[in-house]
Curated annotation (Swiss-Prot):
GO CC terms of this entry: Casparian strip; plasma membrane
Transmembrane segment boundaries: 41-61, 91-111, 131-151, 177-197
Keyword Kinase on entry: no
Keyword Cell wall biogenesis/degradation: yes
Similarity field: Belongs to the Casparian strip membrane proteins (CASP) family.
Species this chain originates from: Arabidopsis lyrata subsp. lyrata (Lyre-leaved rock-cress)
UniProt protein name: Casparian strip membrane protein 4
BP GO terms, sorted: cell wall modification; cell-cell junction assembly
Length: 202
């Protein structure tokens, strides 16, 4: 007797079907990996904002409290140096206070980017506003740095004498405020770069 063999034909997937499925799996893997590194950038963004808030707040508070009075001869004849004697320092305090307020208000948006790392709208908003805050912060810090330089060194061409030998505490506070302001400028610049990298498509 001869045994009958039964052949079962299994339809093979066409090459076009295989080509159609493979990219979908690859896309899913890329999507997950993109969300992971973007969440990491968002967490770093949040921490940098906290550091920028501390630096900007310290700069505004230090400059706003810079005041020194020198008595001469009698208590009725005194020389005083204060930040509000110079419009540049007044602009510095106001500008840095605005930057500090913005950074505080931007924290919830930074949290949103952590929860939803692939969301584009909050990251784009932060990029635009961070750039504006960076410009304002840089302008205030640079202008104040020029005045602090004159206070320390003077200018012989215009007969502007240095005052830091007499008003040492005042110059120390204003110099510290400028250093803190430039620290916040650095943090904001990094925040702008992070936002730009996060907006890059995977």
């Amino acid at each position: 007797m001869k045994s009958d063999s039964i052949a079962v034909d299994v339809p093979a997937e066409s090459s076009s079907a295989i080509k159609g499925k493979a990219p979908l799996l690859g896309l899913a893997r890329d999507h997950t990996g993109s969300g992971g590194y973007k969440r990491g950038l968002s967490i770093f963004d949040f921490l940098l904002r906290l550091a920028a808030i501390v630096a900007a707040l310290a700069a505004a508070a230090t400059m706003g409290t810079s005041d020194e009075t020198l008595p001469f001869f009698t208590q009725f004849l005194q020389f005083e140096a204060s930040y509000d004697d110079l419009p540049t320092f007044q602009f510095f305090v106001v500008a840095i206070a605005i930057v500090t307020g913005y950074l505080v208000l931007s924290l919830p948006f930074s949290v949103v980017t952590i929860v939803r790392p692939l969301a584009v709208a909050p990251r784009l908003l932060l990029l635009v506003l961070d750039t504006a805050a960076l410009a304002l912060d840089t302008a205030a810090a640079s202008a104040a740095a020029a005045i602090v330089y004159l206070a320390h060194n003077g200018n012989t061409n215009t007969n502007w004498l240095p005052i830091c030998q007499q008003f040492g505490d005042f110059c120390q506070k204003t110099s510290g405020a400028v250093v803190s302001a430039f620290a916040s400028v650095t943090f904001l610049a990094i925040l702008v770069v992070i936002s730009g990298v996060s907006l890059k498509r995977p």
